[in-house]
Each structure stands twice: as structure tokens, then as C-alpha cells.
Amino acid sequence: MNKKVFSFSLLLVTLFSLLGMTTNASAEENGEFRVGMEAGYAPFNWSQKNDAHGAVPIQGNSYAGGYDVQISKKIADGLGRKLVIVQTKWDGLAPALQSGKIDAIIAGMSPTAERKKEIAFTNPYYESQFVVIVKRDGKYANAKSLKDLADAKITAQLNTFHYGLIDQIPNVNKQQAMDNFSAMRTALASGMIDGYVSERPEGITATSVNKELKMLEFPKENGFDASAEDSQVAVGMRKGDTDIEKVNKILAGISQDERTKIMDQAIKDQPAATDSDEQKTGLINDFKNIWNQYGDMFLRGAGLTLFIALIGTVVGTTLGLLIGVFRTIPDSENPVARFFQKLGNLILSIYIEVFRGTPMMVQAMVIFYGLALAFGISLDRTVAALFIVSVNTGAYMSEIVRGGIFAVDKGQFEAAQAIGMTHGQTMRKVVIPQVLRNILPATGNEFVINIKDTAVLSVIGVADLFFQGNAASGANFQFFQTFTIVGIMYLVMTFVITRILRVVERKMDGPSAYVKVEELTEEGKES
């Protein structure tokens, strides 16, 4: 049993190592220019289901369009490399660049002094002005200066220069920063906030789609005081990258008139703007329109969610069984074997405590970006997701298995020992079959949890169902409707899985678990 446990554990380690090595090799320069962006910040970037308006395929996803994409195409052409769009959450862009997951950030990012400490920036490729988005019929709709926004509940996107600008509003009621613009628009529409700070192109987009919103533009003397670099947008690249000067030359060849035309065209081409004129309005029609436009993306996301959850649960449960069995092995009489046994138990205890005691989102950031930064191990997003969910599930299942083993009557252990069975034989032939049945409900519950927990993996850009929902809501500006659809899809998946597992439980229990309808009828008549 010890040899089998060790061999299987070694096999798992080797498998993930080989996957990591394979992915690392594929991440090296192959004539590609990998650009990171949210693909959810229209009109700078958005996601769509086809290549209309010059959109570019997203790595492992659909298509990306927008101003940033068109600039990226010009840079890639100038460098003589193939453009690859890597959809990444805003918080993950800088770590992705530093760890070598992407070659550049072209996502409407300003070259602030704080960011320049971590990454390098090219010359600006766009310059904007800052505005405040409020409700058209709200208290602050007629504000003419920042002073008129006193006491207003104002927010901005997390980890952006916009959030710092709020402090320039006298007596402002500064709210917690939000993760994305979809969340801010929803908060504004629901009355949770009075307004949010954004750049003018985003303001034009928001107000053109939602007529209930209004964009406040202030004269220079009454508006935000921002330095030139803070109002500019530049390409983020790794420090020491020799391509920075090449990119600067390419950007210099794009005239201001051409940049203006590209932005104007992006505002016209964005899905929310084009669809608003073509589609019927109303809540039911909103749901239909969203499904027609993004249904394929949602289904792909749901498929990836189920795949990660299923593989993670199977591998994690197997890992939990092996660990649980190992930790119940009696102490060896051999001093050397006993030492390694205790060392193994110590290592496993640390593993269990670490993965049970830290959030999966933190684990994802450390494993996906940390391994690349510290050791040069670059994992594919899906491989990283499988690894994270598997080891996380293994940590929880190992304790469940251990409890299941201890729940088996001691008399069975004694009886097996009395007839000459070894510990391994006892486990294999007597204990484990009972444990598997006893832990089936817990295993099914872990599967359901994994389906929902894959949502946190969006922090490393895993294109699961939640990630696809974020991308869609960022493009269509319909946060409530989009995530209602996403929520229903999660509910359907978990409901179906739960019912299937109950059928499996009955099958494992045998015919005694069933009651004939005739018997129930007879009992009803007697009562």
C-alpha cells in the first residue's frame, strides 16, 4: 500500500510538472505579440462573438474589438508579429506582464508614477479627459463644477487613477472602489451611488446606451486637475524590453487625425451601440437579445466550468483517499521507516492546513503568477485551474476520508487482522468500499462547490462561465440581465448534478433503497 500511495503521488507530481514544462515551452517567443486587456471596457476594448469590425480572436475565447485592438494590430504589424489577445482581469494585467504571460498591456492604462515603478510605458497613444457619470433625473444632474458634487456618493474603478481624482471633490462621500464599470453602472442605476468617475469615451458609451445616465463635463477651471501623464493612455511593457523603442516609432507613425478616426469608429462599432438601435427593448427582450448575442460564449464557459470542476473533484478525491489512507497507517517498528512516515505526515498536515486555510483566489494568484515570477514556470490558465481545484479539493477530501475510515467499526479491523489480512488488504477489501459509499454525499457536495468556486479563477483569466458573464456585461451594459442568465445556468448545473448523484447513491445502496409504488399505496389504504 505504501509503495502504491507513493507511486501514485509521484505520478500526479510528474504529470503536472510535464504539463507545466509543455506550457512553458509554448509561452516562449513564437513570433507572437501577446497583448493583455479586459475586453470589457468599451469603447477601448470589448468582447464579441464574431470578427465583425476588425475584431481579433481572443486566446481561448471569442473575439475582441475596440480602439485598443486596432492600435494593437498596428503595433503587431509594425513588429512583424502575430497579434494574440489575452483576456485578463484588470487586477491581473500587471502580474501577467511581469510574469511573462503577456508581452504588453494595451487596455486604456495610464502611465502613473506608481505604475512606472513596476512596469515601463511607451509614449501615449491616446489622451482623454475625465468626466462624472450621474443619473439624468438625479440630484446632481445639473452640476456645473466639482463643488456642486459636494456630499455626493462617488466611486471609480479599483486600482485606477480615476479613484484618486475623487478626493478633489469638496466634501465628497467617497465610496468603495468597484471592480469594473458594469458594477458601477448597476450601482448608479439602483441608487447605491450618485455617480462615478470615468474617461470621456466610456462616458459617451454609457450615456448612448442608457438614456437615464448623463455625462458631466466641466470647464478646465472647474474640473479635475490631472497631470498630462495621468490623462494619457500608453502601452505597458516589461522593464528592459528592447521593443519599447520600436513600439514608440510605430505609434509616432499614427497621426492624431487617424487616432481620432479610430476612436470615433470604435464608439460606433461597439456592440452596445449597434445593438441598441436594432433590438427590441423590454426586460424579456433584453434576456433574449443577450442570449442570442452571447449564448455561445456562456455555453463554452459553462462547459469549461464543468470540466474543471469534474476533473478537479475526481483528482482531488483520489488524492484525498491516498492521503487519508496514508495517515491511518500504523507506526512502523523500523526506526528509519517510522521517521519518514512521521515526516510524510508532517508535510501532509502542512499541505492540508495551507490549502484549507487560504482563499482559492489567493492560491490562484500565487500559483499562476508567482511560479512564473519566482521560478520561471509558466502554466497554461486551464492547467493552473485544474491544479488549483485538484489540490484544494484533495486537502478537504483527505480529512473527510480520514473521518470516514475512523467511522468504520473497529471490530472489522480486528476481525481482518485475526484472519491474517495486512493493513493494505484490510483497507482495500474491507474499509475503502465502505468509505467510498459513506463519503459519496460529501464528494457530490464538493463537486457542486467546485462548480461555483471556479468563478474565483477569473482572477487569472480562466474563461469559465462567470468570466464570460463579466465580459458580456462589460460590453452590453446590462449587468442585472446578464448575471441573471449566468445565475440560472449555475443553478441548472448544480441542480442536475445533485439529482444525478442521488440516483447514484440509490444504485450503490441496491434494491433495498427503493420502495415500490404498490407498497406505498397499500400502506396508505391501511392508514
Predicted ranges, named:
Residues 18-29:
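Sec-dependent signal peptide cleavage junction
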Residues 29-109, 117:
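Extracytoplasmic small-molecule ligand-binding "clamshell" domains
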Residues 39-40, 126-137, 209-251, 269-281:
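Periplasmic-binding protein-like
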Residues 53-54, 135-153:
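Flexible hinge/capping segments at coil-to-helix
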Residues 67-70, 84-95, 141, 176-190, ...:
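Short helix-initiation/N-cap motifs at beta->coil->alpha
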Residues 82, 161-178, 246-285:
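Ligand-binding clefts/hinges and TM-proximal coupling segments of bilobed small-molecule sensing domains
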Residues 92-95, 108-118, 165-168, 182, ...:
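A ligand-binding cleft/hinge motif common to bilobed small-molecule-binding domains
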Residues 280-527:
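Transmembrane alpha-helices and adjacent helix-loop boundaries
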